[in-house]
Every structure is written in C-alpha cells, then in structure tokens.
C-alpha cells in the first residue's frame, strides 16, 4: 500500500485478513445526495423543486380565458455564510426566484388565440440550504432532518392471522396505498363476503365499487367466475364437461358416456379418472335434473315472447325455474362454476348482500359513507367518486407505487399512470380472491422490499408542494377576477404560504431534530439515522413487536445492533456502513459477483427484493488466490434463511465483514465476542462521549476511525495536494501542486480553522493544525484535528491502564476506582461552553435598558462589568454574578409619604425601575470567553457594541489583507517565472518594484499573452479583495434583524473546565458502564514489579454475566500494543541506529497470519522512520476489524514481541501495604470514555423554593429547583418503623401545610425549634374534589 507523507506519521497495524474490495463510501451521502436532488434543476422534472412546480403549474382560471405558466426557477446567493448565521441566530437559506408567464386568451376568438403574454421573475420565499456536512442552520442552531422508513406505496395483501374473529378464521385483506390520496382496502368478513373500505371508513360490499365503475351484475360475474354450461336435449340434461374441474369431488351420480361408466356413484374422482376422460375426449355427460338445483345462473334470462324476466343473473336455480326456462325456449343455461376448495362463491355472495343495483345508487351509497349527513346529488356523487381515485390532483401512486403495484400483480411493464384504472381495481380483487382460494401468498410488511426510505429532499419537496397548492387556490381566484390587462405575475403570487410550509417543516417537524453534536461520531450517526416514526409513519404506542424486530432483509442495509433502548427500540435504526438507497428509495447493499464458482471484484448493489432470488455467500468464506471457494459446501443466505450450498450454486458474496453493522457498531473492536445487548449499549454510549482536552487515539481500534473523523467534517481536509506554506493556530496555507492547479489561478488554498466555538451539546469545538511548515500534503490528507480526533483518527476517550480486581468495595456494582494521576494529567478534563443571552425589550411602560447603573446592588457585584453594563472578556464568574446589567421600568404604584419625600429629594429615577439583570445560573462557574452584542436597526449602539464592531472590522481587514498578500505572493512568483523564462535577467527584475513588473513587454508572443493573463488576474484579485472587504464591513456595521419588540440582545459565552470527579459516568466500548466511586491517591493504587501503578480498577464480576468478553481481549491487545510502544521508546532513548529501529517496527507490522496489510518500511526514509517511531512511543495503534479481528494466538504473539507474559496477567502489589496480591491479575490498556452524564449537571439541593399552585407541594426536578419526592413507599417505611413524628413532619410542614411551614420558618429564626402542624393543602384539594362530585363533606371541630 502507498502511504502519503501525512499518513506515514502513524500507521495503524491491521489484523484484517479479508481483502478490501470496496472502500467505505462517503458516510454522509444519503443526506447530501438527497438534498442535491431537491435543489438542482432536473430537466426531466421527476425530482425536487422542478417536479413540484410542474405538478401544480400551469394554473388556469375557472373560465379558461387565462393561465399562469411556470418557466424556470433559480436559487440566489445566501446573505450570510454558515458561521454568521449561527452567531446571528438566523436561518442559512437562499432566496427562490421563479420565472412565470401569464398568458391571456382572446374571449371571442376561437380557442387558443393568444391575446397577451407577460413574463416575470417572482420571489417565492427562502429555501434553507444544507451545509457541506449535511446539516441545516435554522434560527442559528444546527439541525438534522432524519430519514424516514415508511410503508412503500403500492398494493399489499395481508391477513389478520385469525385474531379478529372468535372462531380463529383467517380473514384476508388487500390495501392499495397511494403516495398521496385515499387508501382503498378490500377485506373478507367471517361469512366470506368481500367488502371495501375507503380511508378506513365504514365498510361497503366490494361490488359497490364495481357498480360505481359502471359494471352490471352480469359483467361482474363474468369477470370473476368460469361458466358451467347445461343443455337440454331430448328432455335430458347434458353438461359440458371440463374433466379437470371434477378433481377431488365425490360423484353424486354415475359418470358415464357412450355406454361406458367412468366413475361410479359415491366414489371420489381421482387424477386417474380425469386422465381417462381426457384420453377418450369426452365433451358432454348426462346429469340428473336434481344436479342443477342450487346452481347459480350467470346472466339474465328473459321470455322472448312476453319480455318478462324469468330469472336474473346470480339467482339460484330450482326445478320450477328450470321448467320455465325450458318452456320459454332457453335450451342452453350458463351457471357459475364454484366449489368449496379453490373456486369460492365469494363475489356471487357479495352481490346478494349488495343493496345497490345500478351505477347511481352505488355512487350515492359511496357518497353517504364518505359524507354522512349531506344530501347527495348526482353531480356531487359523481365528482366525489371521480376525485377519489381517478383525478391526478387528488391521487398519485407515484413511480414507486406504480412499480410496486405492477410487480405485485405480476405484470410485465413497471411504469404506468399515477391514478388507478378499472383493471387495477379488478386485478387486486382477483388476486385477493386467489389468495383466499389458496393460490398465492400474503406479503410480509416488515420486509425491506415493502418499506422505503424518504430522505430530506423528498420530504422538503412534499412540504413545498403543499405550500404551492395553497397558493394555487389564491391564484385561481385572482385569475378569475377580471382586469388581467394591468396585472403582472407577481401580483398573483403570495409567497407567505410557501415559506410558511417550508419553515414549519424545517423548524418543527418531528423529523427535523436538534443535531446531536457531542462528538464527531454522534453527528455522523444522527445523519445516518432512519426513523419509522414521524408524519405518515408509525407511532410508538401502536408499533408491535414485529415492526421493531430484526428482519432477515436488514442484512447489510440496517444495523441489527444500534437502536435506542426504551420505548423507541427497533423504531429508530441506523444505516449499515455500505448501504445506500436506489432510485425508488429502497435500501440496497453491495455484493461481489460470483461467476462459475469464481468470486470476481465486480460489485452489484442489490435491493431486498432482488436479493431474494440469489444465493449469497458470507464475507468470511475462504477463497484461494484465484478466487475459488476452498470448501465444497459454503455457508450462504437464500430467501432469508442461512444454510449450506455447494460452491457452484453461489451467485454473490458479501463485500466486507462489517457490511452488516452501522458506523457506531463498526468502531467496537472484538464486537464478535460481545453479547448483542451489551454491543447495543456500547454503540449507543460512544455517541455520548465528551471530547477530552487532549484527544488520544485508541490503541485498539477497528480501522474505521479515520473514515469517521474525515467524513464527519470536524477535521480540515486538503482539497488539493501541495506544500504547507504557512501554518498557525487559526489558518493553514497550502501552495498547490502545479498539476492540480486550474489554468490562470494563484494556486493557493487557504483553510481557516474553527476556534473554541460552542456545540449544540455545550461541548467545545476547536481545530488544531497537525501539519508543519514545508510538509508535502496530498488531496484528502488531514490538515487539522477537530474535537475528538487525533492525527485524523476518531479519538473519543483515553487509553487507560486497567486492572480487573476487587478493591475494598469501591468497585461494587459497576463502580469504578480511578487513580489521582488521571486527574493530575488532565486525561478526562473537558471544556464546556455555555451561551447565556440577555434580551432587552420594548415594554408597555418603556424600553428596558442595558446599563451598569442598577438599583440596590453593591459596588462588588458590578466590579466585573464595564461602563455599558456588560461583563469583561476573561472575567472569572461564579453562580449569582451579574453578567449583563439590565433594568426594566416598573408600573407606577401608590407611593407612601416617605417615598414621595425621597422622590422629591433625589429626583425621578429612584424607584421606577427594577433590576432584571442576566446572572450566572446557580452551580455554574467559568470564564467569559466572548461577548456578542446585537442591536436593532435604528437603535443607538452602546460603547461596548461599537468596540466589538471595531474589533471585528480590524480582524476582518487583517484576515483579508493577509489572504491577499498570500495570493499576491503566489501570483508574483508565477509572473517572475514567466518574465525570467521570457529573457528578463533575474537580478534586474528583483531590483524593480513588483508593481512595475507587469509593465514590462516580452518579445515572445506566447509569454506576453501569459503575462497579460496574469496581469488581468492581479487586477481581478484586488477588485475581489475590495468587494469582499466592503461586503464584510456592511455586514458588521448594519443593524441586526431582531424579533419584534426586541431592542438588543447580548450573548455571553462562558467556558467551564470540568475535571473528572466521583459521580461522573464512564464507559468502555463494550457496554461496560459505571460511575466513579472514588479518586484514589496514586500511592494507594495497585502497582506492578516496575512500580507502575494502574489508572483504573474495574470489577471482574462485571464481565461473566454480561458476556461482553470483547473488553478482556481489548485489554490484552492494548497491553501488547503498549509493550511494543515501550520497546520502541526504550530504543529511541538509547539512540539506537535507525536500521535496528526499522527492523523491529517492520517485525511488529508483519506479525499475524496472512494479514491483508503490507507495510514496507524500506520505502520510508530514515527521517520518516524516526517520525513514525516517535508517534509509536506511547503504543502501536492496532486495528482489529469487526468479525475479522485478531485471533487469540496473534494476541499472544504480539505480547511475546513486547516482552510481556502471554497470559496477559501480571503480579500486582497493594499500594497501601506493599504486599503482593495472592494471584496474578489481568492488567492491560482499555479505551475508556467519559460520558455526557456529569455529576455537575445533575447534583442539586433545595432548602426552600417554589411550590405547585394547586397542591402547594414543592416542585420536582433540577430545572424547577425542586425537592426530592417522599413517595408512597417511603411513607410505608416510616409507618413500619413507627416513626410517627418524623412522618407527621414529612406530610405537613415539610410538604404542603402552608401556615405550618411559614410558622416553622419564623420559629427557627427565633431560635424556637418547635413545629405546629396544621391541615395539609392536598387534603383540602381532596375535599374540594369530592364536593365537585356533589358529595358534601365537612370536617367537625371537636
């Protein structure tokens, strides 16, 4: 493998054996591609905004004299960039401008004569834009739109599995689900009649729909039944014989023909009998007259002479009727062929219960069911039925729905109209009847072929269309009003409904979620999440077990491990690593093609439905060098089952062992040794890890760390290769390689880094460069590390030296004992940034004012504020300190004489304002790192706001001029090269000032052209700089667009440094979580023979019952990795020659049986080897991919190489006594995470505080400053102990005895420790509730 200069800094040793056929795809593509489809212009008009416009336009007036046509649209440039939007609290969006054409036709002239055409561009609101990382900035906060897994449109056949009716009879149903429009359900009832429901309303006999489609009874019977024809010849009854229909029946008479008896009366008719009848070509047999009684006629029979109806279609024949028919000359009688086995009489029975007999009565019946209580008219009934399923405005199956519909009915073509046809409805009924007759299977709703993904783009398009439809109604009205000659398109369109619909979706839809930004992994996982909840999806309460369960089709599409615990389990899932959606929105996963038993590198993506037709081998099947399967029998999956197949039956093979799991689960090493429940917790808890002060790469990883860190967008990644020309904490400049430059550009890339900003979860986002001056970089190299990344690898926690042993009960029940060294070295110190805002409003009594002049506040409290009343940057503040001084006007009250006097002496200001300053919340302390002041347009800016503005302008100017200098330098170096190659002497050139270079002329025409081109560029560059500076200046100095009634907003940012402490929650990656019970002095910790103490002591009893053995293997492998690092460290300290170092590192990389990774250190220079060794000092990072990891033997070999005992256990000594523990202890390195459940955020105590209004009991919870509930069971405990006085105190003065508690307070102040309990308020509430029921209850005074 070829490594770039940056990648050579630290190479992770990979234990993976299976070759990597397919690289991990870009992990955010599901979001970015979907949104791209939404906003990019689609000439076909199938997706996105274009599709929405085409579906609504052209809009015609009611008279048809004019119409508004859609031409095209364009998205403008956003006003602010992403960072500015976040600071200002606005939405990152672009204006949508649509070109519309108003066409007016001549009234008197023949149709289609155009009188006037006007075209105009109309503003249609703002469309939020997606950032490069797949998020949206809505009102200043980053949000993610989660993809939804919903039932695909189409037709589904299902059954109630015998649960509806008490007899346990299975009732089948069919449901046609459109993309938008009414649902159509067909269902059987226990009596086997077929019914229909529209939109889950009252059920009607199914034939009503057919009658409404203008079918007569005869035609209905004709559609669903085969005929049995009887003929009357010579007073004998003959039946046309189709032998196959007799199979399985019992003969009720002798079946004979031509004097030969084929079946005797009372015998069963078998296949042999049928073969004989077919062989002798018997077409008719004679039947006794009684045989026809009870048969059902298939059409109307009329007496030709009188025109009288003898018997109507679907009537049962009797012998009398037969005689009448014979008399009136009908010698041929057609009846319906039915039997109890596979030709049930369901439709015939349904026609009998159908109260309607013609189209009109059917339409009226449907109208009554849809609009109960409204008087039906013929027109209303017809238009309602037309609009239900046959109008393109109201009903759309969509391309997906039509494809699924046609596939389900086994039709050949998969495209068609979006509305239903007569044939569609009849085919669905036919298939449902076939299923009831035992032919065909019902569908599995949980199959991923029947559920599809709706991503951002599609949901945004739907919302946009909703807005457009609202506009359409208004436009129709306007078009019909007249005086069109003066109107322009923009007078027709009101953009409000559109922007309201879009805003509502992005701001408050259930699937638009506040982004989980704890760390890079939680960001990526959130964007790859798939939810079955949300509009048009399931609800938690109604979702049963089946929907939540893992389905065989999840394989490689949805992760079986990562899902929340709790009420949402199984409803919210995560996309697997390699999964993607196809054009229809179904999930598909890649497989390697197998041709004639040889596995090729050809990759095919298969959806769940396609996969069902193939035999697919597992990724861990053994192959030889040519790609043949080694074993004769290979474990494969086929049709959702796993079994053995011979190798020539295999069609496909998995691409990777980690294809089954999601990104989160693929980061757990030795996942294959963990129980699924714990793996689930491990995958979920990695998302809660707080980024530590110094990120530390995991010693034992899975090889996915780099992909996650790069794709999450928290790191700065090189867009093009080049050399590092300049680097400091906030900017990296790359001089681009010649071959990657665009013609005529300066060839400089500038990367501005994010410094100390706040994330959604109040953690700190900060980027630090990890390249040095002069280093070569290639495209895709990581230039700067973000939060939780280390040299471009995800680093959520720290490598800790752990020992598995009990220690004085401090690790009882998953508690964790931590060494003081961890605190001293700041291993788990995290920085949290809080934003506190102070809003100054315009009130009825006058404006609120931000000032340092606050009534009744001492000098000390104002010491940290400047003269504008805003805290200084760098001030250290604690709970209760004033950050921003603010006073609010107070209502005039009746003044006492004393106050009047004070007023008279000291003037007005004395008492008409109250202090409403922004203070630091209780329990929070930190350092002020930034202050932002936003002032409404037209409000005078205070001194502090002007200072901040001045500073921002200076900074912007400095940044831009530095950028300009860098770009100029790049440009002039190219100009110099052209001049020198054109014959100008270098020395003379360097003496000339640079501005004069461009005035020189060259004889060589081509060089002169190049020079002129560069000169043009130079002018453009300066012009661009001026434009940028002006835009920046305008943005900084202009007033802010604040909410109505708001004059000023001051935002203060506090940085809080949190060390690890008892009560914080920690976890490993295997679901092994615990709470810190004690921080132990280093000298008391167990230590080994070299005197190295352990950092963390874990309880060994946490392993066996939880079955997450992965943590033990990780510990051993971590020990080996550290051992190798220690040896390299020793060699570096002894300054051994590079050759020895190179040889040892090479041995470490080569270790392991047939691993895929080949690191060849002979291609590294000595400097590169030394730098690699420097980065391996703290341990050699190791990758052990999921399901393809290091084997036990390989771990032992690695331990041996590091001169460590192969058992992984060492002798430890007690730190307090120095005595040896009685048996060796497992010690190693485990990657531990500090989770975002910190004791500082949770600890809370109350003395007195707020009370509930009704019950007068203290509130609960930290947010309300509430108390701890003394509940039912606690009361029982006190009762059981007979602690009567304590109990009385708990139920009265400490809770809701209002008078008692105020008296108690007074008593304590007076030093009199007595209580006088009275009546608890909640008892009064009970009395009131009983009285409200009309029962008078009174308490007697004794």
Curated annotation (Swiss-Prot):
Offer one Pfam family short name for this entry.
RNA_pol_Rpb2_45
Keyword Transferase listed: yes
User: What's in the keyword line of the UniProt record?
Assistant: DNA-directed RNA polymerase, Nucleotidyltransferase, Transcription, Transferase
Which superkingdom heads the taxonomic lineage of this protein's source? Bacteria
Q: What class of enzyme is it?
A: transferase
Q: What is its EC number?
A: 2.7.7.6
Can the keyword Transferase be found in this entry's annotation? Answer: yes
Q: What is the reaction catalyzed?
A: RNA(n) + a ribonucleoside 5'-triphosphate = RNA(n+1) + diphosphate
List all membrane-crossing ranges.
none
Annotated PROSITE patterns: RNA_POL_BETA
Q: GO MF terms on file? A: DNA binding; DNA-directed RNA polymerase activity; ribonucleoside binding
Q: Could you tell me the Gene Ontology terms of the biological process aspect for this record?
A: DNA-templated transcription
Coiled-coil regions in this chain? none
Q: Which HAMAP family match?
A: RNApol_bact_RpoB
On assembly, the entry states:
The RNAP catalytic core consists of 2 alpha, 1 beta, 1 beta' and 1 omega subunit. When a sigma factor is associated with the core the holoenzyme is formed, which can initiate transcription.
Task performed by this protein: DNA-dependent RNA polymerase catalyzes the transcription of DNA into RNA using the four ribonucleoside triphosphates as substrates.
Q: Which family would the database say this protein is a member of?
A: Belongs to the RNA polymerase beta chain family.
Query: What name does UniProt use for this protein?
Result: DNA-directed RNA polymerase subunit beta
Q: Which organism is it from?
A: Salmonella arizonae (strain ATCC BAA-731 / CDC346-86 / RSK2980)
Phylogenetic classification of the source organism = Bacteria, Pseudomonadati, Pseudomonadota, Gammaproteobacteria, Enterobacterales
Q: Which gene encodes it?
A: rpoB
């Amino acid at each position: 493998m070829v490594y770039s200069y940056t990648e050579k800094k630290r190479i992770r040793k990979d234990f993976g054996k299976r070759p990597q056929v397919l690289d991990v795809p870009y992990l955010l593509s599901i979001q970015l591609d979907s949104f791209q489809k939404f906003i990019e212009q689609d000439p076909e008009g199938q997706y996105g905004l274009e599709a929405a416009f085409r579906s609504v336009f052209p809009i015609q007036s009611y008279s048809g004299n004019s119409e508004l046509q859609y031409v095209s649209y364009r998205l403008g440039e956003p006003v602010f960039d992403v960072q500015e939007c976040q600071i200002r609290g606005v939405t990152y969006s672009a204006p949508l401008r649509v070109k519309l054409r108003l066409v007016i036709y001549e009234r008197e002239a023949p149709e289609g004569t155009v009188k006037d055409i006007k075209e105009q561009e109309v503003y249609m609101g703002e469309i939020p834009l997606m950032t490069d990382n797949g998020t949206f900035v809505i009102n200043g906060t980053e949000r993610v739109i989660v993809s939804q897994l919903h039932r695909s449109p189409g037709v589904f056949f299902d059954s109630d599995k015998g649960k509806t009716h008490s007899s346990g009879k299975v009732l089948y149903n069919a449901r046609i689900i459109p993309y938008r429009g009414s649902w159509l359900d067909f269902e059987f009832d226990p009596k086997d009649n077929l019914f229909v429901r529209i939109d889950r309303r009252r059920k009607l006999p199914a034939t009503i729909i057919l009658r409404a489609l203008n079918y007569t009874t005869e035609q209905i019977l004709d559609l669903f039944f085969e005929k049995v024809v009887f003929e009357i010849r010579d007073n004998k009854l003959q039946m046309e014989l189709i032998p196959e229909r007799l199979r399985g029946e019992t003969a009720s008479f002798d079946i004979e023909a031509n004097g030969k008896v084929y079946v005797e009366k009372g015998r069963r008719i078998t296949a042999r009998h049928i073969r004989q009848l077919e062989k002798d070509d018997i077409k008719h047999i004679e039947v006794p007259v009684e045989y026809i009684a009870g048969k059902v006629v298939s059409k109307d029979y009329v007496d030709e002479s009188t025109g009288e109806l003898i018997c109507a279609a679907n009537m049962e024949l009797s012998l009398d009727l037969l005689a009448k028919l014979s008399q009136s000359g009908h010698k041929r009688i057609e009846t319906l062929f039915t039997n109890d086995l596979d030709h049930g009489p369901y439709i015939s029975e349904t026609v009998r219960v159908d109260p309607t007999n013609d189209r009109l009565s059917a339409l009226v019946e449907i109208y009554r069911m849809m609009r109960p209580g409204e008087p039906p008219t013929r027109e209303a009934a017809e238009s309602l039925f037309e609009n239900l399923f046959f109008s393109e405005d109201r009903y759309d199956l969509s391309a997906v729905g039509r494809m699924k519909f046609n596939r389900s009915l086994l039709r050949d073509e998969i495209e068609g109209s979006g509305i239903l046809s007569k044939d569609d409805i009849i085919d669905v009924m036919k298939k449902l009847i076939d299923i009831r007759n035992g032919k065909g299977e019902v569908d599995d709703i949980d199959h991923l072929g029947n559920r599809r993904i709706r991503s951002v783009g599609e949901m945004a398009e739907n919302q946009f269309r909703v807005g457009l439809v609202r506009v359409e109604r208004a436009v129709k009205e306007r078009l019909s009003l007249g005086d069109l000659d003066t109107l322009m398109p923009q007078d027709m369109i009101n953009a409000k409904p559109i922007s309201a619909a879009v805003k509502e979706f992005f701001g408050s839809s259930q699937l638009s979620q506040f982004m989980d930004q704890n760390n890079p992994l939680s960001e990526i996982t959130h964007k790859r999440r798939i939810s079955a909840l949300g509009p048009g999806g399931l609800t938690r309460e109604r979702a049963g077990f089946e929907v939540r369960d893992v389905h065989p089709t999840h394989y490689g599409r949805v992760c079986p491990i990562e899902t929340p615990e709790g009420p949402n389990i199984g409803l919210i899932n995560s996309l697997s690593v390699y999964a993607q959606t196809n054009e229809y929105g179904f999930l598909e996963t890649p497989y390697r093609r197998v041709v004639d038993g040889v596995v090729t590198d050809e990759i095919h993506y298969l959806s769940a439905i396609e996969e069902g037709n193939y035999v697919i081998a597992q990724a861990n099947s053994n192959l030889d060098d040519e790609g043949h399967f080694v074993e004769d029998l290979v474990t494969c999956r086929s049709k959702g089952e796993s079994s053995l197949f011979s190798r020539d039956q295999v069609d496909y093979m998995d691409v990777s062992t980690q294809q089954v799991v999601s990104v989160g689960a693929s980061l757990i090493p030795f996942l294959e040794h963990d129980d699924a429940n714990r793996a689930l917790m491990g995958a979920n808890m990695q998302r809660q890890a707080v980024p530590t002060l110094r990120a530390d790469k995991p010693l034992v990883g899975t090889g996915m760390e780099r992909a996650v860190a790069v794709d999450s967008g928290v790191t700065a990644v090189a867009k093009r290769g080049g050399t590092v020309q300049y680097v400091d904490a906030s900017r990296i400049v790359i001089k681009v390689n010649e071959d990657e430059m665009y013609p005529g550009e300066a060839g400089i890339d500038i990367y501005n880094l994010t410094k100390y900003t706040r994330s959604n979860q109040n953690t700190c986002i900060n980027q630090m460069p990890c390249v040095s001056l002069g280093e070569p970089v290639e495209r895709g190299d990581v230039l700067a590390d973000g939060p939780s990344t280390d040299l471009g690898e995800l680093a959520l926690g720290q490598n800790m030296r752990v020992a598995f042993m009990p220690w004085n009960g401090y690790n009882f029940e998953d508690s964790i004992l931590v060494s003081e060294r961890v605190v001293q070295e700041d291993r788990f110190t995290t920085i949290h940034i809080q934003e506190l805002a102070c809003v100054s409003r315009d009130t009825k009594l006058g404006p609120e004012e931000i000032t340092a002049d606050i009534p009744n506040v001492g000098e000390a409290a104002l010491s940290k504020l400047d003269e504008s009343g805003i805290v200084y940057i760098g001030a250290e503040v604690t709970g209760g300190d004033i950050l921003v001084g603010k006073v609010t006007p107070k209502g005039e009250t009746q003044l006492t004489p004393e106050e009047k006097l004070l007023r008279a002496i000291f003037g007005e200001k004395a008492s008409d304002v109250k202090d409403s300053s922004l203070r630091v919340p209780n329990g929070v302390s930190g350092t002020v790192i930034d202050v932002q002041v936003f002032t409404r347009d037209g409000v005078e800016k205070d001194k502090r706001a002007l200072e901040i503005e001045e500073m921002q302008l200076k900074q912007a100017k400095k940044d831009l001029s530095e950028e300009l200098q860098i770009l100029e330098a790049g440009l002039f170096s190219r100009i110099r090269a052209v001049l020198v190659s054109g014959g100008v002497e270098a020395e003379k050139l360097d003496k000339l000032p640079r501005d004069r270079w461009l005035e020189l002329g060259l004889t060589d025409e081509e060089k002169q052209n190049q020079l002129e081109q560069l000169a043009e560029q130079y002018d453009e560059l300066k012009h661009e700089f001026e434009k940028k500076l002006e835009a920046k200046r305008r943005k900084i100095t202009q007033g802010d667009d604040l909410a109505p009634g708001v004059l000023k907003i001051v935002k203060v940012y506090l940085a809080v440094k949190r060390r690890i402490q008892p009560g914080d929650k920690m976890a490993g990656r295997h679901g092994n979580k615990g709470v810190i019970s004690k921080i132990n002095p280093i000298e008391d910790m167990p230590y080994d023979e070299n005197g190295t103490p352990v950092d963390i002591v874990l309880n060994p009893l946490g392993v066996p019952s939880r079955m997450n053995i992965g943590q033990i293997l990780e510990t051993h492998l971590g020990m080996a990795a550290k051992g190798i690092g220690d040896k390299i460290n020793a060699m570096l300290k002894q300054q051994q020659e590079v050759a020895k170092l190179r040889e040892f590192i090479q041995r470490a990389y080569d270790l392991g049986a047939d691993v895929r990774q080949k690191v060849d250190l002979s291609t590294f220079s000595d400097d590169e080897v030394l730098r690699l060794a420097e980065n391996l000092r703290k341990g050699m990072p190791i990758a052990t991919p999921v399901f393809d990891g290091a084997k036990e033997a390989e771990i032992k070999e690695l331990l041996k190489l590091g001169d460590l005992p192969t058992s992984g256990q060492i002798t430890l000594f007690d730190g307090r006594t120095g005595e040896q523990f009685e048996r060796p202890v497992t010690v190693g390195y485990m990657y531990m995470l500090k989770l975002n459940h910190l004791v500082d955020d949770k600890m809370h105590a109350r003395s007195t505080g707020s009370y509930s209004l009704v019950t007068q009991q203290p509130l609960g919870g930290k947010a309300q400053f509430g108390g701890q509930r003394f509940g039912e069971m606690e009361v029982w405990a006190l009762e059981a102990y007979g602690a009567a006085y304590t109990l009385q105190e708990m139920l009265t003065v400490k809770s809701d005895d209002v008078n008692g508690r105020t008296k108690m307070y007074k008593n304590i102040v007076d030093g009199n420790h007595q209580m006088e309990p009275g009546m608890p308020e909640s008892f009064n509430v009970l009395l009131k509730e009983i009285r409200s029921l009309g029962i008078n209850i009174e308490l007697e005074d004794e």
